Amino acid sequence: MTRQSFDAIVIGGGLVGAAIAYGLQRQGLATLLLDEGDIAFRASRGNFGLVWVQSKGLGAPHYQRWTRGSAQEWPKLAAELKERTGIGTGLQQPGGVHLCLSEEEFGKRGEYMARLQREAGNFGLEYRMVRGAEARDMLPGLGPQVVGMSWTPYDGHASPLYLLRALHTGFTGAGGTYQPNARVEGSSAAPNDFSVEAAGQRYRAPRVVLAAGLGNADLAPRFGLEAPVRPERGQILVTERTQTVLPMPTTTIRQTEEGSLMLGDSKEDAGFNLGQSPEVMRKIAQRAVLSFPWIANLNLVRAWSALRVMAPDGLPIYDQSERFPGAFTANCHSGVTLAGTHANRLAPMIAAGALEPGMAPFSARRFNVRSAA
């Protein structure tokens, strides 16, 4: 007989939902993970794979701390998943760089990083602006167009697909229930008493977590929540495999464990259009070749686009329902970077029944001017 009662239901089987479900199950909560399947706009399959700190949180120190915290949690999460599942996530954290192709870019980047450091306050932020011979010692093969770069020791990268597989395997291995092809067809909400209809079944739990990416916009009001998220298209190019040549990732280029180079970082307002633009692809390739001219000798073997989950201010939304306690929402566009905090910090809060006070700046109420005032 199919189990229908759980301690928690997580809606959304991508990187965000899987990390939270894994964390809840590890906390001892019998958790159901509902995954809509391939009809969903799968942001996870298009994730670039950076574990990135240095470009996050300008004007939002709480987000900078949350991101740094996740980078710190990542080694523990990766080691635990490897031990429990035998699946490596490909995590490497050698630091990372943002390349600047003009003096103007370098100057603006220096100002950006200095402001991030000031906003970090006592929390601190270690970074360096690197030029010339030192930059080329750190990254052999840099092109003459590269004026310099910013570096921080916190950054790294991992495989989004290996991570997703490890989280799912770790979740079910710990006793979690995974239901694929389970689009939410109906629901009801009362304080600490929720029911969800999916895959022809009705499930109940005192906690429900909305982690369905762009689908949260429609789901949230059913549970007394708001998720004003919109799609932002990003495109990625992938080269053939080559010898290991990049000792650390950049904002727009990283080398996978298998040897391929991933090139990306486009940001497009294209609605829900998952198509690809030759002009955008040309710009991605052009910047990559200006950064490392030897990339021009590699063949491109794959290209795709995916939709990021973006709030109006670009920051994550984490919220709990005042009307229906026990209902939570998690929305972000950094499912790989934030996997550490989602599994190791956010999930324990949800298990305890409430978000910690320090999470208040992430609430969607920040978009309601009257409430924020």
Question: How should each PLM-predicted stretch be described?
Answer:
Residues 6-33:
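N-terminal Rossmann-like FAD-binding beta1-loop-alpha1 element of flavoenzymes
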